[in-house]
Amino acid sequence: MSIIGAAVGIGAQDTRCRQGPDRLQACGLMARLADEPHGVSWSGTVREDTGVDVVYESARFCERLARKVYDALQNNPRIGVVGGDHSCAIGTWSGVYQAIAGNGPLGLIWIDAHMDSHTPDTSPSGALHGMPLACLLGHGPGALTGLGVSGPKLAPQHVCLIGVRSFEPAEAALLQKLGVRVFDMDQVRRHGLARVMDDALAYVQKNTAGFGISIDLDAIDPHDAPGVGSPVSAGICGKDLAESLSKMGRHPGLLGLEIAEFNPDKDVNNRTAKLVIDLLAATVGLRG
């Protein structure tokens, strides 16, 4: 696995999550992953430029990130991206999409307390980290929906959300109209995360060339992950998620894992940083 830092905060109201990749490095990310027998490498950090036009700067950043992801997948079977606000997902999965072009569609499991499916017309805040899934599905600013290759990078029937518990009606309406599968937090509590992840895996690997997992850390309960941009109570157990990722990591169709919205300034005793490292370690087959 090739690990890439996505040092971006321009898409969020609290921009301090741009510090996430550097803090993870300082907390021993690569030292922990060094024992992985098949090799885990650090491919560098893509950093945002700041400017007045947020959409323009975000598109420039995502273009660079997509290129980095694409290049990494030419020499590695999988990528890991650590952020950084969740607008980085537009770059991450655009890069994966381009890397597998011609082999088939991309499947994606989106683990998040929010739907991230606003458009500029529906977003109360205008923050781009509330729009990345909509952009990947082809709904949003042209500079972001047309990243790399024009058109949607994801088909609705190959996407599912897990852990949703905070959203606006316009987002739900868009996803319902498109037919995107949503496992909300009530379903996770009712059936257990392991079963929901199994169902999601079966869904996104059907008729696809491979699948990815995008995690917004606010999907996790704030007790386990306090260092996030937009915490929402009553979330997924961090340990349960690590166990599920350990299983997912053994699946040959997994193309990449993205972990976004780590805000070091809100962390408590590096609890969130350690959890991010544990999640990556579980995915590459290392025990805690």
Give the residues covered by each predicted segment.
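Catalytic cores of soluble, metal-dependent hydrolases
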Residues: 2-10, 14-80, 92, 99-103, ...
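Short, well-ordered beta-to-alpha junction loops that form the rim of enzyme active sites
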Residues: 7, 83-87, 113, 164, ...
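Active-site histidine-anchored catalytic micro-motif
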Residues: 77-147, 251
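Active-site environment of divalent metal-dependent phosphoester hydrolases
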Residues: 118, 167-169, 264-266
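Flexible, glycine/proline-enriched loop segments at strand-loop-helix junctions
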Residues: 118-124, 134-135, 158-162, 184-188
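Active-site glycine-rich loop that binds ribose-phosphate moieties when present
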Residues: 127-169, 195
